[in-house]
């Protein structure tokens, strides 16, 4: 029996996963990087230090790996770089060398899209939205035999990502970081107000809605209404991006991934409006399951 390792070290999670020859995820371990109370996040050097400390807590032991796939950059575009992914590449190389395994350099975005493909049947050409704390991308994806061959970015945020919008508003409301789950709970009792986002073709700006909402909070808007307003704005923006991408490309199939897609209200609204598919909730946050799956598929294709 052969086994396939995926490793991802993102801004806030250390992750390892193992797939077997049949493509089943048989091991999935993640450890969040702890953000001290009152802080809005961590610096890159703090993230790298924490990954180094806790990678041993998530690393699977006792598996003879045939292939290892790791995220070596945030996205599949020139100039995409973060120090945390350099650390991930180094650990992955050591794991591959120790096992005599093949080594595949992929990206954090590959991992999210591949994780979303687990349990979702998609055509070989589809639209993918990667929506997280650091990314709000609209992409055209080409795959073959379960392998992502090409990711083309069609549009992105021109300033902050959807997840940053959530966290900045959450921090202003005094909820713990990361703020997504807390805002989703608050929004259940809130009434949303409309915010206007600015679009440039398939690019979007969230800074305007953020500023407008922070002003409303300063004037006394309740936490519940503010949380509901964030959700409403993000869902509306993503629906518009999907429609623009479908019109531009002629591609109808859509798959959404990333931590923001853990929000059940947002996903329900998008599904109702567009018929899009989503990563399973357990695969929406940062994880290494998609990378393990790709390691298996790439290895099998090469045999």
Positions of predicted regions on the chain:
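Conserved phosphate-binding catalytic cores of ATP/NTP-utilizing and phosphoryl-transfer enzymes
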Residues: 1-2, 101-127, 293-297
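A short helix-loop
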Residues: 2, 9-10, 17, 26-28, ...
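Conserved active-site "lid/cap" helical segment
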Residues: 13-72, 216
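Short beta-strand-loop/turn "lid" adjacent to the catalytic site in phosphate-handling enzymes
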Residues: 57-93
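Glycine-rich beta-strand-to-loop/alpha-helix junction loops that act as flexible
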Residues: 70-73, 132, 254-263
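Active-site nucleophile and cofactor-binding loops and adjacent substrate-binding regions
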Residues: 82-87, 103-111, 129-131, 159-160, ...
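Glycine-rich phosphate-binding/hydrolytic loop that grips phosphoryl groups
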Residues: 112-115, 279-303
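A contiguous, well-structured pocket-lining segment that forms one wall/lid of small-molecule binding clefts
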Residues: 181-254, 260-277, 296-303
